[in-house]
Each structure stands twice: as C-alpha cells, then as structure tokens.
C-alpha cells in the first residue's frame, strides 16, 4: 500500500524547483536536506498528542453528544408539532375472501400458474360482458357491518378510466358515486398503539366502503421487461375510505392495523399486509394550527392544506414512516416559502424521503361514468339483518370483558388472548377457566375470584412459552384444557408447588398421557407438608452457613437478605416440600426473635 504513494512523492519531488538549494538544478533526484522543503515526509510512528482523550472519556462524550442531539431533535419536532397540524386520510384496498372473481366465474386462487385463471371478460375481449358474482357480496357486507357502516339498499357501479398495462379494459369498475356502504367508524384505544397525544380513545370515521376490481400483478425485469399475471385482474376488492381525521403517524398505522384485524375477525379477508392481501394509500396535508383559512376540502372537512397521496404502502411501519417523511417534507417546503403541490408520491422501505411519481390526476381526469353493462345492486334488509346477527363479537368487546370484573385480566394479557390464532387460544382459555371454577367450587369465594387471572398466566406464559421454545404452532390438544385446569387446581390447593406444576405441564406437553392425579401420585410429586420441627432444623442449618449475614439482618434490619436463607432451605429440603412463606416465618422467628 505504501509503494505507490512513495513513487508518487518521488515524481513530485523531481518536478519541484529547488530554490532553497545553492547547487544548480540537476536532472537527477536531488538530496533534500532543507527542513523547509515542500516534499512530504513519511511518518511511520504515531506522534504523541498532548491532548489525547482516554477511550472511556471519549465514549462518554460521544454518548452525551448523541443524547443532546436526540433531545434537540425532540424539541424541534415538538416545536414543529405545536406550529403545524398534520391531517391524514387513508384508503385501504383489501382482497375479499371469495372463490370467484367479481365479474367472472374464474377462480381467485393465488397459488396457480400465472395467467391460468382468466376469463374472457378479465382480458377485455371484445363482446365479453361482466356478470356480477353474488357470493362476492357476502364478505363485503360482513366487512362493512363490522366497520359500523350503513348498508345502502341500492348501489351502482361506475367506470374509472385510465390507461395502464395492468388494466386491459382501459377502465376499472368501482363504486365511486353510489357505494354499497357509508358512514361507518372504527374506534382506536391505547392498546391499539395510538399516539399518546391522541389520548385514550380516538374514533375515525369511515366515509364509504365500495366494491371494485383488482388489477393485474406486474413484475419488472431490468432493463425494460415487464411481465403481467392476469390471475389477479377482477379479484374482488373492498376499498375503505376513512375521513381525514387522523393527526399523528402512529395513530394512522394503528388505524390500518385495527381495520385489518377487524376484516380478518369476520372472515372478510384471508390475508393481510404481510402477504399482499391488503394495501394502503395515505393522503397527507399540513396546515398551521388554528388556521381555518385553507382552501381545500376533503370528505366534507374544510380549511385543510393541499394534500399529497402516497401509494401502495404494504406494511404498518411503512404507513407510519411514509407519513413522517411526507410531513417533514411539506413543513420544509412551507417554511421555505414554497407551495405544496397536489401530486402522487411513492415510498421505499428504509428511505427517509418520499419521491414524486406523477402530478395528481384530478377526479375529472378519470372520466367517471355509470357502467352501462351492470344493473343497480339491490341489497335486502333481511340479508343485512342475518349477517349482522352472525358477526363475531368485536375484539374491543372481548377485551373489555376480559379486563372487567369477571376475569380481571390486564390489557397485556387480554389483547394477545383475543388476537392469537384467530381466537382459538381464547376459546381454550375459556374452557380452562370454566373447568377450574367447577373444580374450585368448595374453596373460599375470595380465593376463587382470582382464578381467571391465574389461568390466563398459565395459558399465555407457561404453555405459550413451551410452544415458543419448541417452535410449534398452537395445538389445543397437546395439553387438554382439563389437564391444565387440574394442574392449576392442585397449585391453588397447595398440593404441589409452582415449580412442580411447571414440571408436570412440561411432562404432559412432551406426551405423557397419564391423568394428572395419577401422574402426581406415581411420580411422588404431591406436596407432603413438613412439620414445624423439620422447618426449624432446615432453618438452623441455613443460618449456620452464613452467621455474618445473620448479624447484618439483626443489626442493620436488612430483611431482604432473608430470601437467601429461604433459598438455602429449599435447596437443602426435599424437592417441592419446602414452602417459601412458612420458611420465611420460621427464619424471622429464629433470627429476629
């Protein structure tokens, strides 16, 4: 590495005028002895710096500087938030859970070969006509009802005209003017992940829910090849349009997450963002707080700033990050005296800026018009009533029930019980609680009051931990609800200790098919209480091991150190027979008198 540098320095030295040297210039390499010569000297050893900073001090300085930078950034963001108001509206496109396409009998399977599930109408063959598939309406209605929408008895289909290779007809069939559902809402709570500044509860209005076609799936190959799979053309979609009532990026992401969970809970969709079954577009605008003079109006809300649309966001994090980036961009434009343009922008995962895709096409550019080939869609009140009565209980109601007086679970336990395995674990938990309450009927009502909380801990953390460790999916048959309830029952009756109960659970999890009472008896795991004399003997043996700690407890009242002696007693005693509260009481008696 040094040789090229040396050669370069030598060549440079040859070309220098030797004005300091009294000898005439020679074409040969001169001997450079003057300290004022401009030739660089190669230094092979580090010079001693008198102000060298020790590594530890340097790390502390760097950490302090980073902390100060973060604090300054937070203060800047807070100042910006106080001055500027963010407004966000969301459009969610979700693939419906149907076997056929919206206007043809072709299959909606996503696993078949490309271009193998395509009808003539999907490819816009001349003379082909749309044929509305009635079964596709059912999951759409379930979605709209779960979002608290008013179902319209009459709705109509419109053509949205644009030219792109993924839409062979040159237009998309949608419901722009008369959608089948309007005026819904979604409630967001703290446990949904909304921003702290939004409080404990936010209600976001749903302007409308409409049926529409999906487009073809395209794959680009560098430099100029693009392949199209028309299997996805005319796949039934619902487009869910929220009101522009969101004011923080975190709440926007929480809204998309909550809507996806609602759609999945009512079987309206089969896949979410993680598999491409749901996509989101966000409309972002900025205005000064308190400014009602804005000229723009969206969804009936006026006084807003110029909006930009960010298309095709495919994850919750992308929704939040893209909004943050676009908010910062618009604020920078406005603070520099510029004007925000109405346009469509894109977002790349990992980026810190949105990018311009095209100028925003106005509604008139799409040339919306009623579809002349499709009759009005009539929806009967009896169908709506039947579907409404068969909807599952909402997650918010379930969480409210689980955190209420009857079960007393924390939000941290209630939420995963509702969300995991599409409610399968919640059903298992309910079975465990019901069996356990029956087993504990002869016990004190006060102690029975906490059974639901205890069962929640065992279902989520103990059994769930075994599944996670073994990298296995949920299986309610692996440990039956009866077996788990009997294990908890024995713990509550103090017939086995907590560690023994976990050992028994692991044995059943690993395939032991014996009934719990039989297993405990045959493995000699039942707790046979120690006598007072046995506790005293163990305590005296533990005390003799560390008289210095005993003195600290007596003279300095360091009662926390009693736990060490309790642990020693449990290790010295027969496994599972020493009860910590009783051991602690004996130790206090012997040490403190």
Swiss-Prot record:
Residue stretches of biased makeup (Low complexity): 27-42
Region annotation (Disordered) ranges: 27-80
Primary location class: mitochondrion
Record's catalysed reaction(s): L-glutamyl-tRNA(Gln) + L-glutamine + ATP + H2O = L-glutaminyl-tRNA(Gln) + L-glutamate + ADP + phosphate + H(+)
EC number(s) per entry: 6.3.5.-
Any GO MF annotation of the entry: glutaminyl-tRNA synthase (glutamine-hydrolyzing) activity
Basic and acidic residues: compositionally biased ranges: 66-80
Subcellular location(s) of the protein: Mitochondrion
Swiss-Prot/TrEMBL GO biological process terms: glutaminyl-tRNAGln biosynthesis via transamidation; mitochondrial translation
Listed InterPro entries: Asn/Gln-tRNA_amidoTrfase_suB/E, Asn/Gln-tRNA_Trfase_suB/E_cat, Asn/Gln_amidotransferase, Asn/Gln_tRNA_amidoTrase-B-like, GatB, GatB_Yqey_C_2, Gln-tRNA_amidoTrfase_suB_CS, Gln_synth/guanido_kin_cat_dom
Source superkingdom: Eukaryota
Pfam entry (one): GatB_N
Listed GO CC annotations: glutamyl-tRNA(Gln) amidotransferase complex; mitochondrion
Top enzyme category: ligase
First and last residues of the transit peptide: 1-49
Keywords: ATP-binding, Ligase, Mitochondrion, Nucleotide-binding, Protein biosynthesis, Transit peptide
Subunit relationships: Subunit of the heterotrimeric GatCAB amidotransferase (AdT) complex, composed of A, B and C subunits.
Family matches, as PANTHER family: GLUTAMYL-TRNA GLN AMIDOTRANSFERASE SUBUNIT B MITOCHONDRIAL AND PROKARYOTIC PET112-RELATED, GLUTAMYL-TRNA(GLN) AMIDOTRANSFERASE SUBUNIT B, MITOCHONDRIAL
UniProt function note: Allows the formation of correctly charged Gln-tRNA(Gln) through the transamidation of misacylated Glu-tRNA(Gln) in the mitochondria. The reaction takes place in the presence of glutamine and ATP through an activated gamma-phospho-Glu-tRNA(Gln).
Family: Belongs to the GatB/GatE family. GatB subfamily.
Protein name as it appears in the record: Glutamyl-tRNA(Gln) amidotransferase subunit B, mitochondrial
